[in-house]
A protein has these predicted regions:
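Structural transition elements
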Residues: 195-196, 316, 333-367, 384-389
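Gly/Pro-rich hinge or "lid" segments in bacterial periplasmic/extracellular proteins
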Residues: 70, 158-233, 358-359, 363
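N-terminal lobe/hinge region of extracytoplasmic solute-binding protein
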Residues: 33-83, 113, 190
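Long beta-strand-rich cores associated with HINT superfamily self-processing modules
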Residues: 511-535
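Surface-exposed binding/hinge segments that line
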Residues: 80, 124-174, 194-201
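Extracytoplasmic/peripheral linker and loop segments enriched in polar/acidic and small residues
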Residues: 88, 309-312, 316, 324, ...
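Ligand-site clamp/hinge motif
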Residues: 183, 213-265, 308, 396, ...
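Acidic-aromatic pocket-rim loops
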Residues: 46, 278-296, 301, 415-477, ...
């Protein structure tokens, strides 16, 4: 494994030297590794972290983020709410796509329309948008169906694409991943961001070279000074041991997901440092509460998860403190809430777990008609979240103690996400980040009924549906101030009462890197190499 890392790194360094010579800057290559690889490079297809962590180096939205995740001007230099349902964005001038095409107002109109198409997984960010209109070459208005007080925050995740380039490559709609569609945008990009795609070999390496024409290199992107990295070489390395060996030997500079059991060794290792902080991400166990009969269970003719007592039983059978202490080695924040504390709308009084109580769990199962338990299959990724497979292994053992015999089906993120997006699951582990830093994003994506508006229930593969919850989510979309917070608070209470999920914990995210690399640690677990400095 290390041999091919060496060979790839040498090739990348040679490529970086050529690029740096052409751009007049000293070559600074960062070799980056994590366990998983993006399953697409289409900027409007898959709203998952393994995709966005790469694409944010290449593409940009009208609004971007500072290192502290606060909104900042991106391809729009300013914006204002002209009317309750009309936002105006003033576009940055002189910007070109990596292919040479000028960035125009028509590209903005096209990009928002593309993100609204049925094959897009980004409907949650554009659900209130009726249409975008080019006022003139430098101005775009976004007209919403209803007042949307957090629109600028939501569209940070909507990246701008070149309309002519998309049309030329028959890519005017997002890739349909459910149909396993292969399009030009799966392996090719054309953004305006700080880095452009140089090499894409799925599951092997992705090389991104500095875009010397990027506007932000002139220090125009907030208070954080720009970095000096001229090239990024990303390699998925599934093996924890190999990934850490590569870092310790100096063959990798940055590891996004070091295993928790290696942190103490990394902290004391020469030439290596560890950055740590809380992530805006919560892990849950999600039940299929929609089907009349589970796909993967020995219970026939009914769905045990439709019974609140069964969901409560499996919740109370989980010793979350044991998972925190042993599986996560203290690197988690135990929660009873849908959202973490950093998210707008969080209510501490609603962050209360059902107590761990195996006797109560057995009693609830018996009351529900399952005195001897039942069998079910738990779906779990094995390379997406910190210790994801180990968490699922611990839970299956805990459920077995109350009579629920659980088969664990763990797999890499690409087939795992494809499976749950086909509704081919009975119960599964999900981690959910909140890029908007607002509670609506989680409620609308995970708990809104799937027959609602655009973006509603887009990740609600448990098919939870509650009319009152839908009403509260509708209020969150349009109301402001105390009325909006009251809706969020009631929804958090209803979430606790209905138990559509078992909330587990918020992740703590360690990053491991060589000491000659400096990069701001981000709570969304997304490395921004535009601010990285390599010495």
């Amino acid at each position: 494994m290390l041999a091919w890392i060496r060979a790839g790194a040498l090739a990348a360094l040679l490529l970086g030297g050529v690029l740096a010579a052409a751009g007049g800057a000293e070559a600074r290559t960062v070799r980056w590794a994590a366990s998983g690889d993006p399953n697409t490079l289409d900027p409007h297809s898959q709203n998952v972290g393994t995709v966005t962590m790469v694409l944010q180096q290449i593409y940009e939205g009208l609004v971007t983020r500072n290192p502290d995740l606060s909104p900042a001007p991106g391809l729009a230099t300013s914006w204002s709410q002209e009317e309750p349902t009309r936002w105006r964005f003033n576009l940055r001038q002189g910007v070109r796509f990596h292919g040479g095409e000028p960035f125009t107002a028509e590209d903005v109109v096209f990009s928002f329309a593309r993100a609204q198409q049925p094959t897009s997984n980004f409907g949650i960010f554009v659900d209130t948008i009726d249409h975008a209109v080019a006022v003139d070459e430098r101005t775009v208005d976004i007209v919403t169906k209803v007042p949307d007080p957090i629109l600028p925050n939501k569209i940070i995740s909507v990246y701008m694409m070149s309309k002519p380039w998309s049309e030329a490559h028959n890519a005017t709609r997002p890739q349909n991943t459910r149909a396993r569609e292969e399009t030009h945008t799966v392996r090719n990009t054309n953004g305006t961001g700080p880095y452009r795609l140089a090499v894409r070999e799925p599951d092997v390496r992705t090389v991104m070279a500095r875009n010397d024409a990027w506007w932000g290199w002139q220090g125009q992107q907030g208070e954080q000074p720009p970095g000096n990295v001229t090239e990024i070489v990303y390699r998925p390395i599934a093996s924890d041991a190999t990934r850490i060996a590569a870092l310790l030997s100096g063959e990798v500079d940055f590891v996004l997901d070091p295993p928790l059991q290696d942190l103490n060794r990394l902290r004391s290792a020469s030439g290596v440092k560890v950055l740590e902080g809380p992530e805006v991400r919560t892990l849950y166990i999600v039940f299929d509460v929609g089907r009349d009969e589970l796909l993967y269970s020995d219970v026939k003719g009914r769905n045990p998860f439709k019974d609140l007592r069964v969901r409560q039983a499996l919740y109370q059978a989980i010793d979350i403190q044991a998972i925190h202490r042993t599986t996560m080695r203290g690197q988690s924040v135990v929660t009873g809430s849908l959202i973490p504390e950093q998210v707008n709308g969080y209510v501490r009084e609603e962050d209360v777990r059902l107590p761990y109580d195996q006797a109560r769990a057995r009693a609830l199962l018996a009351e529900a008609g399952y005195p001897n338990g039942f069998q079910v299959t738990l779906d779990c990724p094995n390379n997406r979240y910190i210790n994801d497979e180990q968490i699922c292994q611990a839970i299956t053992a805990m459920w077995a103690r109350v009579g629920v015999r659980t088969s664990l089906r763990s797999q890499p993120i690409a087939p795992f996400f494809a499976q749950i997006q086909r509704d081919d699951t009975s119960v599964y582990l999900l981690g959910w980040g909140v890029p908007t830093l607002d509670a609506l994003y989680s409620f609308q994506s995970l708990l809104a009924s799937r027959d609602g508006g655009p973006g509603d229930g887009i990740w609600n593969f448990g098919r939870y549906s509650n009319q009152r919850m839908d009403e509260l989510i509708a209020r969150m979309k349009t109301e402001t101030g105390p009325a909006r917070q009251a809706a969020i608070r009631e929804a958090l209470k209803l979430y606790r009462e209905d138990v559509p999920h078992v909330p587990l914990h918020h992740q703590m995210i360690p990053w491991a890197m060589r000491t000659n690399l400096t990069i701001p640690h981000a709570a969304n677990n997304q490395p921004y190499f535009r601010w990285a400095v390599m010495n």
